[in-house]
């Protein structure tokens, strides 16, 4: 009896001698020609379309460039006002809280157990 590893069941299964001696994945009768292309039709490029795309919305890049490139001595992470300040402060509060929590957890883990 000959055995071969089954990739489907992940176990050894019975096999014929010819399949047991041939390595898996390497077959002698592999076709030499490549398969047909799945996407053989040419795709239409965006530049070829005549109508404007409606789902993109307004281009906000020039407005954001104007805001972020202004030299008003405000840090870049606070340039957009109140939402940026709120996000910055909440991020810093969570970071400080997480560091304190880790330090307390390390302190409690370092204490010997009471018997």
Curated annotation (Swiss-Prot):
Read off the InterPro entries from this record: COX7a, Cyt_c_oxidase_su7a-rel_mt, Cyt_c_oxidase_su7a_sf, Cytc_oxidase_su7a_met
What UniProt keywords are attached to this protein's entry? Membrane, Mitochondrion, Mitochondrion inner membrane, Transit peptide, Transmembrane, Transmembrane helix
Tell me the null mutant phenotype. Answer: Fish are smaller in size and display abnormal fat deposition and decreased female fertility due to impaired oxidative phosphorylation (OXPHOS) activity. In mitochondrion, disrupted interaction between mitochondrial respiratory complexes III (CIII) and IV (CIV) leads to decreased mitochondrial respiratory supercomplexes (respirasomes) formation. Phenotypes are rescued by doubling the food supply, which correlates with improved bioenergetics.
Gene Ontology biological-process annotations:
mitochondrial electron transport, cytochrome c to oxygen; mitochondrial respirasome assembly; regulation of oxidative phosphorylation
Where is this protein localized, as stated in its record?
Mitochondrion inner membrane
The answer to whether keyword Transferase applies is no
Q: How does the protein associate with the membrane? A: Single-pass membrane protein
Q: Record's GO cellular component, any one? A: mitochondrial inner membrane
Named in its record, the pathway it takes part in is:
Energy metabolism; oxidative phosphorylation
Grouped into one coarse class, the protein's main location is: mitochondrion
- Subunit text: Interacts with the mitochondrial respiratory complexes III (CIII) and IV (CIV), promoting their association.
What is the name of the protein in this document?
Cytochrome c oxidase subunit 7A2-like, mitochondrial
Q: From which source organism is this entry?
A: Danio rerio
| Source lineage | Eukaryota, Metazoa, Chordata, Craniata, Vertebrata
* Gene (UniProt): cox7a2l
